[in-house]
């Protein structure tokens, strides 16, 4: 929000009052979730369509207030072609005392990867380009020591030129309830995060990319488990049961005991599972879908894989500036998180207008 306060106007949309700068016109609701509602709008300053998200009850509780601060800090930090970034942030409040609402403005993305998969069978070249961009974005995110945690087709926005942006970081940890049953929230989750095996690392995101890539190649969900146990069985049927070395790393005794009770299964030959796929694609999948997260390929390593030979450019796969996450371990009151958030809103500097805009 720039220092000179713009003129705001109010309107009601879906029983919610929106109070936005005159710069944003023609608001129309496009969706809502637990953490806010989103409208498409026309940005009269740039001539582009944008998404405006109004956070719902951003300071209702300490958890809400910290999540609000986290989301704003993350979005402000992200400056990469393959990652959603912040175009604007504003509040109608004139002072910290009045501050209760936060609005975030990002690119309006036309379709997500779900729409793309459903509509057409993708060529191998399409798959290369899409997965390359996901990994390019992940290399950047991971270099800032951030883990997405929730990569799935609906969190990957794609325009008609096949240009991709990663959306919706796993800001809020999913509740058990959201992970229960036949749900996409879980189908792309690494086993160690789904089953709380151990402290996880950035390669949980690589497992998700493997699941997404397999789906792009076959047109089918790779592990559509009906519940946690069914999902684990589907995973182990493909990658084989864990050996002694991995079992030792699983800190949860109940998880260890359960796995040891299962019949031993060998890893399947991926070439027989992904029949007709480019052998280099199969080789990359074998390196992503590894049960032991310490042995999974990283995003930076995957970008250098031969499968991406026509896209890989080590001089154009940037890393992020360091990201200070020390706030994560802080226990503050609602008003303290609110004050920190207000400072972030006030200090926001918009990206340069001539930046290559991604049209949907």
From Swiss-Prot:
It catalyses: L-seryl-[protein] + ATP = O-phospho-L-seryl-[protein] + ADP + H(+); L-threonyl-[protein] + ATP = O-phospho-L-threonyl-[protein] + ADP + H(+). One of its GO terms (cellular component) is nuclear speck. Signal peptide: none annotated. Its main location: cytoplasm. Keywords: Acetylation, Apoptosis, ATP-binding, Cytoplasm, Kinase, Nucleotide-binding, Nucleus, Phosphoprotein, Serine/threonine-protein kinase, Stress response, Transcription, Transcription regulation, Transferase, Ubl conjugation. The modification Phosphothreonine is found at residues 16, 180. Transmembrane segments: none annotated. The modification Phosphoserine is found at residue 2. Belongs to the protein kinase superfamily. CMGC Ser/Thr protein kinase family. MAP kinase subfamily. This is Mitogen-activated protein kinase 14.
């Amino acid at each position: 929000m720039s220092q000179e306060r713009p003129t705001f106007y109010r309107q009601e949309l879906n029983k919610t009052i929106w109070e936005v700068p005159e710069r944003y016109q023609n608001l129309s609701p496009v969706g809502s979730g637990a953490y806010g509602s989103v409208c498409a709008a026309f940005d009269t300053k740039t001539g582009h369509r944008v998404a405006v998200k109004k956070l719902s009850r951003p300071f209702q509780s300490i958890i809400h207030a910290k999540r609000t601060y986290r989301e704003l800090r993350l979005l402000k930090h992200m400056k990469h072609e393959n990652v959603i970034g912040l175009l604007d942030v504003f509040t109608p409040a004139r002072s910290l005392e009045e501050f209760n609402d936060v609005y975030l403005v990002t690119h309006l993305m036309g379709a997500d990867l779900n729409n793309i998969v459903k509509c057409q069978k993708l060529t191998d070249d399409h798959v290369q380009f899409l997965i390359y961009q996901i990994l390019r974005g992940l290399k950047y995110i991971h270099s800032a020591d951030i883990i997405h945690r929730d990569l799935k087709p609906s969190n990957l926005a794609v325009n008609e030129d096949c240009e991709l942006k990663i959306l919706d970081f796993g800001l809020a940890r999913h509740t058990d309830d959201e992970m229960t049953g036949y749900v996409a929230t879980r189908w792309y989750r690494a086993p160690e995060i789904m089953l709380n095996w151990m402290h996880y690392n950035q390669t949980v995101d690589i497992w998700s990319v493997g699941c997404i890539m397999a789906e792009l190649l076959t047109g089918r969900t790779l592990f559509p488990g009906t519940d946690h146990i069914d999902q684990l069985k589907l995973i182990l049927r493909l990658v084989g049961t864990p050996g002694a070395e991995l079992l030792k790393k699983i800190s949860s005794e109940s998880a260890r005991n359960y796995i040891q009770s299962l019949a031993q299964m060998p890893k399947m030959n991926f070439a027989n599972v992904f029949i007709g796929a480019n052998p280099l694609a199969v080789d990359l999948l074998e390196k992503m879908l590894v049960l032991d997260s310490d042995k999974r390929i990283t995003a930076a390593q995957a970008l250098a894989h031969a499968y991406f030979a026509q896209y890989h450019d080590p001089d154009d796969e940037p890393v992020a500036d360091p990201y200070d996450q020390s706030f994560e371990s802080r226990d503050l009151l609602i008003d303290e998180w609110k004050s920190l958030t207000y400072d972030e809103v006030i200090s926001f500097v918009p990206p340069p207008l001539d930046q290559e805009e991604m049209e949907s």
